[in-house]
Amino acid sequence: LHGMEKAKGKDYIKNWVAVIGDSTFLHTGVNSLMNMVYNQATGTVMILDNSTTGMTGHQQNPTTGKNLRGEPAGKVDLEALCRALGFNRVRVVDPYDLAAVETAVTEELAAKEPSIIISRRPCVMIKGTVHKPAIAINQDACKGCKACMQIGCPAISFKDKNCLLYTSPSPRD
């Protein structure tokens, strides 16, 4: 994001959001954010804080407050870290609150300075994660308006004037 802005200009990246996971951010992303502030970039970065290192098997990382053995350990505060790097615009959203996410992205893309959006929700693959109840589709109430399609859920589809919901067993079962 920052390199593209410097190479092509601010208008080129005005609607871009760089996305990085919490673990990868701590592994390789901190320096990039430092460079954004130092070089007066204007981009928006979204950190997906899911409280695990999903890409390698769901290990602990410095944002979880536990070490690799699951014992208590120091916890990196992502908001404080981003502010310490020089970001004035740091906000946290719940990715289940789509309206809040949309508002955050819209506002931060319009900002004239670099900004951070931390999307925080524990990974559904972590044991003990509290889940919202599963959704259901009431076919009798379906009007065929396709409003359900606007959330972008891959489990919801629309065929022959009917909203369909794909269900499968939970990977934790």
Q: What do these predicted ranges mean?
A:
Residues 1-116, 129:
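Thiamine diphosphate
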Residues 71-74, 131-136, 169:
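Short, exposed beta-strand "edge-strand" segments with a Pro/Gly-rich flavor and a Y/T-containing core
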Residues 107-158:
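Glycine/aspartate-rich loop-and-adjacent alpha/beta segment that forms the canonical ThDP
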Residues 163:
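Acidic, glycine-enriched active-site microenvironments
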Residues 166-173:
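Conserved small/polar residues in nucleotide/adenosyl-binding loops
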